[in-house]
């Protein structure tokens, strides 16, 4: 297990990097989001972290090329949980960049069961982490937190660097108060808005799968997200970017998710208005890089 950061993930002074003359503290590139594969890149000038590895080598490289990123190295791969859409490409990613893997012990055991032998052969160091733990990778401070999902030990993450904070929070059945606390004071919030309740009920999934999605260890509905966004005691509206992610192809669509979120944001008190940008992450193509 790695040592927790002694300052418990408080921001440490660093330097921002430049993009076209503009100073950037942290860049976020959501390369894919959805049930067919999840992949997010976080960068400072000196550190590069990949969150999840749900795409194969060829598609991962193609997505990076489409946003003009040619990575000669990675400093870490972090895995939120062992479901295929978050880890299927992990053996190839580890082989490509020979980077350390950061994962909880129960999730690591699950990965060893569900991934091929090439996964074990390509490991280049495993850093065991725990929910609630804070640690640093380069100049990025990371905080892992527990989320309610039907996996071995699912976690979300917050990242701090150069005064900016990013949160990655998908694959959870509901929004516990502690999760809401972790998401406060976030400048880029990547939040699941998986399904529309009515579309799910009449959709193609078998009833047992619908029950799983709707459970407290399933996925967040548009309605659950709207209730969170409308509540100033939950969502603090600090975010410069609010990204709706992990949108179901079968039981949702981007317009429905966006309208639900926009309506919720109009219900906020005047003194707590959201003035940031509402964005939709896609399964099929990267979102433009978000710079903080």
Label every PLM stretch briefly.
Residues 105-156, 160-163:
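Metallo-beta-lactamase
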Residues 88-97, 113-114, 252-259:
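Metal-dependent catalytic neighborhoods of phosphoester/phosphodiester hydrolases
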Residues 8-12, 17-67, 154-171, 188:
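Conserved beta-strand hairpin/beta-sheet module of binuclear metal-dependent hydrolase folds
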Residues 276-292:
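Short, basic/aromatic-enriched C-terminal tail that caps enzymatic domains
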Residues 36, 84-86, 109-110, 151-152, ...:
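Active-site environment of divalent metal-dependent phosphoester hydrolases
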Residues 57-104:
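Active-site metal-binding motif and surrounding structural segment of the metallo-beta-lactamase
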Residues 51-54, 74-82, 103-105, 167-170, ...:
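Active-site neighborhood of phospho(di)ester-bond hydrolases with catalytic His/Asp-centered motifs
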